[in-house]
């Protein structure tokens, strides 16, 4: 859920990045994580790790762009001895841009806060639709684990959201599309992943 001001910032940041990279002739690769860089079942990147590290050693910048939280992406960096810039929560925040160029900030927020999103949701979504929605953050850890497919020790990182509310929609496709329209008219967007919506 990026605000209009967020869209302007997002465009400005990427225009600046590409201008700077063009001047320095650097290569940047933007990649998703789950199901792309990471195995969709094990969340490991063993199969591509050697090639991945070879690219980094050649000075190629790799920027994960993920629905994952800042906490999850920091953990990914730490667990794999990496220091990557990254885009968290479906473009809601950009981290470590100063690693790409010293004139860029460390962190840019281009979305509403979780509380702002919750307030818009409460004010604009009917009870009928609310009854079709499971809020992942409100579930017990075991149920969160079943839905997200993550080990228990990773759940606490996955639910540490700053700019999105993970949900599971329990209605028909027609109802889901209507729900999307209501959110859009309320100034919010929703992303559908392999397991949940944000």
List the predicted regions and their residue ranges.
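Short, small/polar residue-rich loop motifs at catalytic or cofactor-binding pockets
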Residues: 23-26, 49
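Asp-based phosphoryl-transfer active-site loop
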Residues: 25-41
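Active-site phosphate-binding/coordination module
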Residues: 44-137
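Conserved acidic, metal-coordinating active-site core of Asp-based
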Residues: 128-198
